[in-house]
């Protein structure tokens, strides 16, 4: 399995979201996963928190994220917190 880190988003000092491309059994995937610092090591380890998608789902994902962003900035959307 090949793996190529493409982008990372810092969350906290000891955590980040890593976005990478992976090849597995001849198929390409986009993996978005939270990584954390291993204790007493200079190493980041993957957590169970993440998402792995086939490459053909990237465009629908981007479309959905765009709609979420538009909804957040739209005046007709009211976000409620659970009581």
What is each of the regions a protein language model found here?
Residues 44-60:
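Beta-strand-rich receptor-binding modules of extracellular spikes/adhesins
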Residues 12-15, 30, 41, 75, ...:
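Intrinsic disorder/low-complexity signal
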Residues 17-49:
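A short, structured beta-strand/loop element
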Residues 1-12:
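Negatively charged, low-complexity tracts enriched in Asp/Glu with abundant Ser/Thr
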Residues 55-83:
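Mixed-charge, Lys/Arg-enriched low-complexity segments
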């Amino acid at each position: 399995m090949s793996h190529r880190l493409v982008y990372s988003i810092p969350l906290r000092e000891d955590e980040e979201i890593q976005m990478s491309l992976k090849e597995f059994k001849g198929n390409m995937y986009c993996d978005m996963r939270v990584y954390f610092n291993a204790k007493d090591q200079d190493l980041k380890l993957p957590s169970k928190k993440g998402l792995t998608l086939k490459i053909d789902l990237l465009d629908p994902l981007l479309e959905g994220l765009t709609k979420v962003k538009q909804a957040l900035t739209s005046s007709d959307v009211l976000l409620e917190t659970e009581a």
